[in-house]
Amino acid sequence: MEPRAGCRLPVRVEQVVNGALVVTVSCGERSFAGILLDCTKKSGLFGLSPSTLLPLADNSSAVSCHGQAPEEGTGEVMQLETGPLHPHHKDPEKDQPPKTAVSEPPPPLIPPVPAGNLPPFPPYFEGAPFPHPLWLRNTYQQWVPQPPPRTIKRTRRRLSRNRDPGRLILSTIRLRPRQVLCEKCKSTVSPQEASPSPLNTPKPRRRLGSGPDSEHRKPEEPEDSAVIATAAPRRSKREKREEDRVAGERVPRSPVIKISYSTPQGKGEVVKIPSRVHGSVEPFCPQQSLQNGSQDSEVSRDVEPRGGGDRPPSGSSASIPKLKLTRPVPPISDLPPPKIRLKPHRLGDGEHEPLYRAELVEELNGCPRGPLVSSPALFADGSSHGLEDLSSGSSGEDDDLKRFPQGKHGRDGLAFLVDCPGRRTDCTSESVCSTDSLDELKSSGSEVTSPDTGDLSSGDSASVPSSSADTRQTVPPLTVRLHTQSVSRCVTEDGRTVAVGDIVWGKIHGFPWWPARVLDISLGQKEDGEPSWQEAKVSWFGSPTTSFLSISKLSPFSEFFKLRFNRKKKGMYRKAITEAANATQHVAPEIRELLTQFEM
């Protein structure tokens, strides 16, 4: 009889394993073997979803067992009680077991545990082999034995034997300082580092009797003097003070004057006038005295200039230098440094070169410093005895120089006189005056302009008590003469012609290339008439400011547009570019020729 759906067949239980039955059934000449599962357990077989076994749970109540699992050799047959079976099918099954049973019975497993001690998930038991990893990933709601957790091997850092575990390891690599600038640029950008006496590291307190020898020995020391100083044994402050006082009494010296020329482009030169021993030059200024606030007795101060040893700038730079007289840090806190102001002085109706005289401001913060007596003598063109004329100009972004009315020769000039009066007896280090620009130095015929106040300070020097307070020596003023000539057209070194009214690109340090219009062109000349520089006064588009730039720093707007234009800039930059482009269209060649035809 062929098996069909709905028929009932007697089966033989071969083995019982944790609620699962291994059965065999013979149907005619064929034999079938399989596993029957306990449908009351909702977990089902490994890898099968429980939903496939739910329909069989309805008929589970009709299944009953007539006996326990038969041992080997017995022929008991389990049959279902849901209906009568045909007799010809029952007799052969009882008489002899089927010969077509499982050829290889499963390996003997551990004996089944009692019903009360069954594990919660029947298909697996303690000691079962681990499933395949793919099966392990595809199964979810079943209990699957997991391998023991692996130990992750971590390499620990070796700690130093002489170091505490709680302390961090500091790197022992010694890095060299970055050399951002070369020696020439370093002395130009920061001239304080190249000065004879160190201005960046002043002493916290300086007294009246400190000597100059230590200051003058410092330039001769090597660069690693700090390392040598730390290795040498330290001396007490009293010993140093006594040595400085003894050394200061030997050689009284005049102040060191330093003039630094710097431009926004980072180029410039430094002119240093070192100190000289007193008595080498005749006194220039009349007697002056200064009372010390902490002492009753007057102390005198002898100041002498350097005569013929002045050296001019090493060469004329491409950019127009800016006259900037820097000063060191004030030496003491009890007496602030005196102030100087510049006043114009007219020599006569026929003179076209105004002279400016630097004077000490009489009172500062309400306390008088002493009698203010300026030099009665003023330098004319050829009366600068022992002092060379220094050519200088201004090249700042915000410098708007006011031109003098031109004379018959078409030349503007400026003489800058600085008196260095005595303040204390210990003036050896440096005495420099500070002016940010030449804006206040140049005026348009005004008798007295607003004073440009600079600082005049001095460092450590010797204390030289004099027998009489009336005999004192002072330093002659420092004279700077500027001779400029205004033109309407000039030719650059590379052969380009720059005229008044041209639209050009200009560069200021810290800003991108910016469009500008040339307002005026000035030629700076030395005493012998040789031009030293060419500068142009330009007005920036999109900004009310004007600047003086070197002609070599300007480039035509239209020709260099693709090279100078920055597409990333927005806002005022784009507005300035638009204004410059519109202005370029209006500057026709005939207009340019009209502007330059009145060239002198």
From Swiss-Prot:
Q: Where is the composition biased (Basic residues)?
A: 151-160
Biased region (Low complexity) positions are 381-395, 457-468
Q: Which PROSITE patterns match?
A: PWWP
Q: Where is the signal peptide?
A: none
List where Basic and acidic residues composition bias occurs: 239-252, 298-309
Listed InterPro entries: PWWP_dom
What's this protein's name?
PWWP domain-containing protein 2B
The species this protein belongs to is Mus musculus
